[in-house]
Amino acid sequence: MTFATTDLCDAHEDKLAAGTLRVLQPALRPYGGAARFAGPAATLKVFEDNTLVRAALEQDGGGRVLVVDGGASLRCALVGGNLGALAEKNGWAGIVVHGCVRDAAELRECKVGVLALATHPRKSDKRGAGERDVPVTVLGTRIAPGEWIYADDDGVLVSATSLT
């Protein structure tokens, strides 16, 4: 899929004004091997527990983007190299983590986009806590399941509908 978030913003100023196209605050850093990715959002709300993240990535991604609202925790990682490889194997376009990742060198080798706040060497808990397919909030922006995510070097967009 070829697009530029800058061009999408320019072409859809009406959607930006209406709030059906939103721009995430520029605080996420790239860690995956794909610099540009897009797809409908699958959402998770978790806190310092990545059990649901693994369960989601074990499923066929079908070109979707997994959006993980990790509560902006900087105390452990929710995604690492093994989950990045799993996402690539199962056809996920990308992963957006409102929290941390680890195994940064391994994530760079995966042909999937990965964005997160930071890296952290500690793994998460495995309690199975969290919610799936619910509206989440990432950097103050609400993202509902099925909304479209567009990410590249210039930023991340959330759209109520497909723009390409």
Swiss-Prot record:
Required co-factor(s) are:
a divalent metal cation
Q: Which InterPro entries match?
A: RraA, RraA/RraA-like, RraA/RraA-like_sf
GO process terms (BP): regulation of RNA metabolic process
The UniProt keywords, alphabetically, are:
Lyase, Metal-binding
Tell me which domain of life the UniProt entry assigns to the organism this sequence originates from. Answer: Bacteria
Catalysed reactions, as listed in the record: 4-hydroxy-4-methyl-2-oxoglutarate = 2 pyruvate; oxaloacetate + H(+) = pyruvate + CO2
Among the GO molecular function terms of this UniProt record, one is:
oxaloacetate decarboxylase activity
| Positions of substrate binding | 80-83, 102
Task: Cite the cofactor comment.
Answer: Divalent metal cation.
Annotated a divalent metal cation binding sites: 103
- Check the UniProt entry and state the signal peptide residues, or none: none
Q: How does it assemble?
A: Homotrimer.
What is this protein's function per UniProt? Catalyzes the aldol cleavage of 4-hydroxy-4-methyl-2-oxoglutarate (HMG) into 2 molecules of pyruvate. Also contains a secondary oxaloacetate (OAA) decarboxylase activity due to the common pyruvate enolate transition state formed following C-C bond cleavage in the retro-aldol and decarboxylation reactions.
The family note in this entry says: Belongs to the class II aldolase/RraA-like family.
Put simply, this protein is called Putative 4-hydroxy-4-methyl-2-oxoglutarate aldolase
What organism is the protein native to? Answer: Burkholderia multivorans (strain ATCC 17616 / 249)
